[in-house]
Amino acid sequence: MRIIFLLLLPVVLIQAKPTYWNQFRGPNGDGDAQNSQLPIQFSESKNLTWKTPIPGKAWSSPVVKDGKVWITNAEEDGYKMWAIQLDWKTGEQIKKVLVFKNKEPQFCHPMNSYATPTPVIEGEMVFVHFGTHGTAALDLKSGMKIWERRDFKCDHFRVAAASPITHKE
């Protein structure tokens, strides 16, 4: 199993106070962090607030609400898929929720990951999507699974990459 370090989370994590970044490319879906003073250079000693070792492999972006950061992650072989909650200020892992266990993971190209889609936060739920392996809604505070759907089967060719969005209520 490979260790992936969260060295540089999106610019929303650099800001001094927790923000609301609920989906891929932010609250408006346009990637605008609403701050022209954001750093553009990073290193181990420059503009890095924290880093946390996270075993697994994932390309998804983090989402943020109420001082908590949510990410998705998966074993490199695709047999287990998680939602992970981290503390905004310290990077400490608060929750690691096993969302899906798969008997036969679909092929994933080595340049991709089983946890590529970014989660989305709406209200008091965080939605995680792993393509053909399933979609689930978790309670934002407890991490408990509210519902799951595993009936959408398709051949992603290299694995799922599209991030979910919410539409109305």
Which residue ranges define each predicted feature?
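Sec-dependent signal peptide recognition
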Residues: 1-7
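Hydrophobic h-region of N-terminal signal peptides that target proteins for export
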Residues: 8-16
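Noncatalytic, solvent-exposed loop/strand surfaces
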Residues: 15-169
